[in-house]
Amino acid sequence: MFRSGERPLGGLAVPAEQRDFLPLETTNNNNNHHQPAAWARRASAGPSASPVPSAPSSPRPAAALPASESTDPASGSSNKRKRDNKASTYGLNYSLLQPSGGRAAGGGRADGGGGVYSGTPWKRRNYNQGVVGLHEEISDFYEYMSPRPEEEKMRMEVVSRIESVIKELWPSADVQIFGSFKTGLYLPTSDIDLVVFGKWENLPLWTLEEALRKHKVADEDSVKVLDKATVPIIKLTDSFTEVKVDISFNVQNGVRAADLIKDFTKKYPVLPYLVLVLKQFLLQRDLNEVFTGGIGSYSLFLMAVSFLQLHPREDACIPNTNYGVLLIEFFELYGRHFNYLKTGIRIKDGGSYVAKDEVQKNMLDGYRPSMLYIEDPLQPGNDVGRSSYGAMQVKQAFDYAYVVLSHAVSPIAKYYPNNETESILGRIIRVTDEVATYRDWISKQWGLQNRPEPSCNGNGVTLIVDTQQLDKCNNNLSEEKEALGKCRSNASEPLSKHSSNSSSGPVSSSSATQSSSSDVDSDATPCKTPKQLLCRPPTVTRVGSQDVSLEVSQAVGKMQSTQTTNTPNNANKSQHGSARLFRSSSKGFQGTAQTSHGALMTSKQHQGKSNTQYYHGKKRRHKRDAPLSELCR
């Protein structure tokens, strides 16, 4: 939130009153009015579009908007941030968002957010009040915004395309990934940081830039060479996925910084939750880019580490720490109390605050006043935050977030209208509809949900017979069921306790999500759908060419002779003499079942009845291993 008389980053004018967020109805919101991006046009072309095109058919049209749509009517300046940043919420007024059951213009998905408020797709339930509810919502936000496997796959393909161009120029060059993509703390629209190691007298920035244009890896207008920066880089946008990539040369600290972040993440388990929320908070306000004066990911991470190091709470390292309390106190520290003009941040040796006047005289690039001083723990003479000249605007945004969240978790918040359904975190963070659509497109292009899973039995063998045909097989076994009917009725009482502890063959159908946990006798691949487990007929199992019914007659004879003396306690004692079946592969039984007398094994039935199986010290195959022809005989 920018205060009166100040201008946000990017040169956009701000009137006297705060207008960081404007009503949804205003014409200033162009999120859903500009032409679709390249990935959106290819998605509408159909599923036949290649996920890795060698040459894109057309450039991104967002750079050539009509004048009526690309200009802010209030400020008269080009609304470029809407096109460059899908996550930008400039032009939205959170307090004026109304309940909606669908997509709000520029507000994001409402259907994913419990169908109540737009822009909060992580909100799938009602939370508790106060900081407890904020903690729960931060957890859900982290789960929703965490990288998906298909997003990682898509990014690796982008890296492969760029690496192939680099290898073509310099076969001995080494390309490595660092930054948020390396650590896993990246948002759906975060960029990819690459570093190229090689032997050059002069950095080949323009050589690589020309090669990237020639191979059409990047959009023609997106490739930029920042040769005057402290760390010269090449910035580009992938022509197909619109993923932004930064390429540097021979920078060792980038890879080392990724390892440092992983170490701190292990020490402070709360860090990933805080960092992801803070990155989204800055990203949607265009305060995350260093070359525009914002705070980069590495600086933001070090600020969070310093906050936890010097935090007065003793539970900062405990995994179940309340994330809501820590987030509010982070905003309070860096939004109100931290003195940016006189105080610097040091992470090394447990963390401390230092006087900027003393340490900046010994900096590598000489004495230069810096608005935000953060000492690099990997190179103490390096000021990580020296390029963040817009740190005061970030400070004001943090102060705004502290005020909003403090009121949202206060005791009087329960008297606010819609306090039970309104998102607390959504007061300062929103996910735009463009980001949600972009993630859906990635899931369709690189996800696994469109690949049909073949039906299988319990051993992971593909079924060539329809499940309904297998159900008919159950009707052909009525005679065999009647043959065992009497022994079931006579042994029903002693089996009630014995069956609860005995090993069971088929997987219980009552647990659809844990289809493999109930089968303790099988190491084979479990069936992925419980519906297919229901179709296995409860037939008498064969052992090689011998029928188990021979063993059944022997076991029933012994049971009838001792039935008058057996009690439930004796039935439980016989449990200790029984042996479990162990099978190391789907080829057949490989263990031995040894018992002093006929042991009665009971299996759970998926059709509501209990079926008993008897064996007497012989090797047998599990019923899942029976051939399909035997099941339907």
UniProtKB/Swiss-Prot annotation:
Species: Mus musculus
UniProt catalytic activity: RNA(n) + ATP = RNA(n)-3'-adenine ribonucleotide + diphosphate
Composition bias, Polar residues: 25-34, 87-98, 542-552, 559-614
Residue ranges of the motif Basic, involved in binding of the RNA primer: 618-624
Cross-link (Glycyl lysine isopeptide (Lys-Gly) (interchain with G-Cter in SUMO2)), chain numbering: K531, K558, K573, K587
This protein's UniProt keywords: ATP-binding, Cell cycle, Cell division, Cytoplasm, DNA-binding, DNA-directed DNA polymerase, Isopeptide bond, Magnesium, Manganese, Metal-binding, Mitosis, mRNA processing, Nucleotide-binding, Nucleotidyltransferase, Nucleus, Phosphoprotein, rRNA processing, Transferase, Ubl conjugation
EC number: 2.7.7.19, 2.7.7.-
Cofactor: Mg(2+); Mn(2+)
Protein's name according to its UniProt entry: Terminal nucleotidyltransferase 4B
Subcellular location: Nucleus; Nucleus, Nucleolus; Cytoplasm
Alphabetized SUPFAM superfamilies for the sequence: Nucleotidyltransferase, PAP/OAS1 substrate-binding domain
PANTHER family: POLY(A) RNA POLYMERASE, TERMINAL NUCLEOTIDYLTRANSFERASE 4B
GO cellular component: cytoplasm; nucleolus
Region (Disordered): 1-115, 484-633
Residue numbers binding Mg(2+): D191, D193
Gly residues bias locations: 103-115
Oligomeric and partner information: Component of a nucleolar TRAMP-like complex, an ATP-dependent exosome regulatory complex consisting of a helicase (MTREX), an oligadenylate polymerase (TENT4B or TENT4A), and a substrate specific RNA-binding factor (ZCCHC7 or ZCCHC8). Several TRAMP-like complexes exist with specific compositions and are associated with nuclear, or nucleolar RNA exosomes.
Feature: compositional bias, Low complexity: 36-52, 60-70, 492-519
Disulphide bridges: none
